[in-house]
């Protein structure tokens, strides 16, 4: 059974989108405190997601992480003992991929957020670069988040966990997710032997390849980290023109073909 897992208590957001849920990193280790300056902890209507700072005023997360009350925390490592330079913001404006008013779990799971106030770069806060080109198959990439570290139990860590996974042939994901379109604007990534994966609590977080954000956590298997069940990530490169247009002030930007 496949589900889109929104973090924390697996609460169901009452949105115009479809039913959703989130993910967390299984099989990883504690992230280095100085190597995730772009990572955002998102609290939305009592549910947890991840996100990525892409410049001092803008961030990316998954569309299914949307909610009426969103709190965005930057510069965080330990949730119990926050860094002194932690900063908190709320959305000033949220933008969704505008080809369709309806959310689908295979496409359009991307949300661009303009912050109510720019964040200040600091020891633990700095943006991550947008992609210059898409990742190739077998590229080693990094996942991270405060999601559950158990594939079957809700065990949420105090600090984010990181793991390395690979870009996988899209055909592998289509075999497990029969609704996935052949030309879907997504990436398939994971470890085919199993053991490392996103899980509950990681939705919206980054897939980082060669120092750039290439994916946004969208859909995974249940339980997490099963063999031959990679996860699906929104492909940031395929949304790059839209992202840049919105940031430049063209809020009527349409989807690329």
From Swiss-Prot:
Propiece residue ranges: 19-24
Active site: 64 (charge relay system), 109 (charge relay system), 203 (charge relay system)
Segment forming the signal sequence: 1-18
Location of this chain's protein in the cell: Secreted
Tissue specificity comment: Expressed by the venom gland.
Key words, A-Z: Disulfide bond, Glycoprotein, Hemostasis impairing toxin, Hydrolase, Protease, Secreted, Serine protease, Signal, Toxin, Zymogen
Superkingdom: Eukaryota
Cysteine-cysteine disulfides: 31-162, 49-65, 141-209, 173-188, 199-224
GO molecular function, one term: toxin activity
Glycoprotein listed as a keyword: yes
A cellular component annotation (GO) from this entry: secretory granule
Entry-linked SUPFAM superfamilies: Trypsin-like serine proteases
Domain Peptidase S1: 25-248
GO biological process: proteolysis
InterPro entries per UniProt: Peptidase_S1_PA, Peptidase_S1_PA_chymotrypsin, Peptidase_S1A, Trypsin_dom, TRYPSIN_HIS, TRYPSIN_SER
EC id: 3.4.21.-
Entry-listed glycosylation sites: 102, 120-121
Major subcellular location class: secreted
Assembly description: Monomer.
Main function: Snake venom serine protease that may act in the hemostasis system of the prey.
Family note: Belongs to the peptidase S1 family. Snake venom subfamily.
Name assigned to this protein: Snake venom serine protease KN9
Gene source species: Trimeresurus stejnegeri
């Amino acid at each position: 059974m496949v589900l889109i897992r929104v973090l924390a208590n697996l609460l169901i957001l009452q949105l115009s989108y479809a039913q959703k849920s989130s993910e967390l990193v299984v099989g990883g280790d504690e992230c280095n405190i100085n190597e995730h300056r772009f990572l955002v902890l998102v609290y939305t209507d009592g549910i947890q997601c991840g996100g990525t700072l892409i410049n001092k005023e803008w961030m990316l997360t998954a569309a299914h992480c949307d909610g009426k009350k969103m709190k965005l925390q930057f510069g965080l490592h330990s949730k119990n003992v926050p860094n002194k330079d932690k900063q908190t913001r709320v959305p000033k404006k949220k933008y969704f991929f505008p080809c369709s008013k309806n959310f689908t779990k295979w496409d359009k799971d991307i949300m661009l957020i303009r912050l109510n106030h720019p964040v200040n770069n600091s020891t633990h806060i700095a943006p991550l670069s947008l992609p210059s080109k898409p990742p190739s198959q077998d590229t080693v990439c990094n996942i991270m988040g405060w999601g559950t570290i158990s594939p079957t139990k809700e065990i949420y860590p105090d600090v984010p966990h990181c793991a390395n996974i690979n870009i996988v042939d899209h055909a592998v994901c289509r075999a497990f997710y029969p609704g996935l379109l052949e030309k879907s604007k997504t990436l398939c990534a994971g470890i085919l032997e199993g053991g490392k994966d996103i899980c509950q609590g990681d939705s919206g977080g980054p897939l980082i390849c060669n120092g750039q954000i290439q994916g946004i956590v969208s859909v995974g298997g249940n339980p997490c980290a099963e063999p031959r069940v990679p996860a699906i990530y929104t492909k940031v490169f395929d949304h790059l023109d839209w992202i840049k247009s919105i940031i430049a002030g063209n809020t009527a930007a349409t989807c690329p073909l």
